[in-house]
């Protein structure tokens, strides 16, 4: 069974359909790049997979025992979020909230996980810094570390390199590729198609029809 599957899915806001007739399967270990024009429903689809938006019709089915609370998510930042006055370590630790349950504090295991993910994303040396003082690339790596605290299996990312300079973008892609090689399933929305496809294994093209294909088929 697929890790994540859509069956005759329609997504949108309220009764307004943004994209429909969506069928796909994502398997464990895939690196899926979601592409399409502005307004084609890419971000809406990711939010629907995460249950941040309800489907208008159809279903998103999770397999292999995966729960939505076990999926990490890195969404697009607002200006308010970029200016959040917390330390890097506090931001990353907040990714452990799902595992806390009714426990009103972070334990030693949570802190070890946060530290390990700060190492993986190269932000451990920034742990005491205020988040809003960081560069855009540093902030994105902090948010990725937080998302990794929420999941060891699947990460969904919405335009993770938008607004980053070429060096910061390349570093983000390197980290994502390393995560995928270690077994993490990556699902990423991107307008930065060429570099994204260097690492992707599949493309979900949300054109006139939503089609899942190999990178080779997408490149023609």
Positions of PLM-derived features:
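Conserved structural motif at the start of ABC-family nucleotide-binding domains
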Residues: 4, 18-19
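Catalytic Walker B motif of ABC-type/P-loop ATPase nucleotide-binding domains
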Residues: 155-158
């Amino acid at each position: 069974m697929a890790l994540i599957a859509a069956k005759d899915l329609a997504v949108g806001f309220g009764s307004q359909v943004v994209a429909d007739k969506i069928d796909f399967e994502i398997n464990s270990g895939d690196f899926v790049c979601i592409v399409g024009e502005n307004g084609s429903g890419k971000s809406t689809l990711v939010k629907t997979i995460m249950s941040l938006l309800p489907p208008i019709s159809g279903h998103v089915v999770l397999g292999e025992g995966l729960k939505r609370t076990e999926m990490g998510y890195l969404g697009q930042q607002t200006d308010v979020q970029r200016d959040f006055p917390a330390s890097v370590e506090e931001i990353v630790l907040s990714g452990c909230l799902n595992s806390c349950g009714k426990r009103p504090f972070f334990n030693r295991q949570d802190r070890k996980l946060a530290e390990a993910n700060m190492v993986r994303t190269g932000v451990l040396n920034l742990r005491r810094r205020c988040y809003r003082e960081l560069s855009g690339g540093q902030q994105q790596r902090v948010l990725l570390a937080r998302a990794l605290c929420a999941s060891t299996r699947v990460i969904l990312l919405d335009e993770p390199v938008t607004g980053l300079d070429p060096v910061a973008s390349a570093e983000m892609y390197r980290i994502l590729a390393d995560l995928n090689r270690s077994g993490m399933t990556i699902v990423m929305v991107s307008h930065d198609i060429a570099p994204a496809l260097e690492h992707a294994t599949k493309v979900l093209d949300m054109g006139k029809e939503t089609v899942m294909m190999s990178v080779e088929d997408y490149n023609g």
